A protein has these predicted regions:
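Active-site proximal beta-strand in glycosyltransferases
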Residues: 36-52
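Loop/turn elements at helix/coil->beta-strand transitions in domains of secreted/extracellular proteins
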Residues: 15-16, 40-43, 182
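Nucleotide-sugar donor-binding catalytic core of glycosyltransferases
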Residues: 1-6, 14, 22-30, 54-216
Length: 216
């Protein structure tokens, strides 16, 4: 309720032409309706988590339920799951594919120019964005794949975060570990879908490291 009141007050001050809902859909329908009627504002929503049933990505169903809320009031959607893979009640004309964005102010390492890359392959696993520790008793197919890879190719110098009690690193710590490596591996949970990837691919490719993706 409080956030709705704050947004209504902000809109009274700015009278926006467009409102972008960034990876959330928490406004009440009545608030959206009020803003649209008062200021003819357009609403758009971007979302970058799994939405495709066929891919069986993490929490895809609850993610889909979230974006379908207020679907009669939201004018357009920008999604990192390709619309061809999404079965939804949302009008398909509203759905647009959004490649995972790269920001040159953040992804600026230019690793291809780094001279002291003494490790071969980088991979980072986590149990949630910016979640600082691994969740006890939780594992997934990516961890199993990495263990098999390390057993098959023991001579490769690996830099693996988030496996074998090595907690994830984020921000500066993540970039420091990445810059030590010649290559990286991007693995997505669930089955591969059209144009769909873990959002970590932006941090890898955007920073200029040679990146492998899974093909099954």
């Amino acid at each position: 309720k409080i956030i709705n009141e704050k947004i209504l007050n902000i809109c009274d001050n700015y009278r926006p032409n467009i409102i972008v809902l960034g990876h959330n859909n928490i406004l009440e329908g009545s608030s959206i309706n009020t803003i649209k009627k008062k200021y003819s504002s357009k609403f758009t929503l971007w979302y970058e988590d799994a939405l495709g049933k066929r891919g069986e990505g993490p929490n895809w169903k609850s993610n889909l339920n979230l974006i379908e809320k207020n679907r009669h009031l939201i004018d357009s959607y920008y999604l990192t799951t390709h619309p061809d893979e999404i079965k939804t009640y949302i009008n398909r004309k509203k759905l647009n594919f959004l490649p995972i964005p790269v920001d040159p102010n953040i992804e600026n390492l230019e690793i291809y120019n780094c001279k002291n890359r003494f490790k071969d392959l980088f991979f980072a696993l986590s149990h949630g964005v910016n979640f600082g520790r691994l969740k006890k008793g939780k594992n997934d197919e990516r961890e199993e794949f990495i263990q098999k890879l390390m057993n098959m190719y023991p001579n490769i110098k690996y830099n693996i975060l988030g496996i074998a009690d090595e907690n994830p690193k984020w921000n500066y710590g993540f970039f420091t570990e990445l810059s030590k490596c010649k290559m990286s591996l991007n693995l997505s949970r669930g089955h591969p879908l059209k144009y769909t990837s873990s959002n970590r691919i932006a941090a890898l490719v955007g920073n200029g490291i040679y990146t492998f993706i899974d093909k099954r």
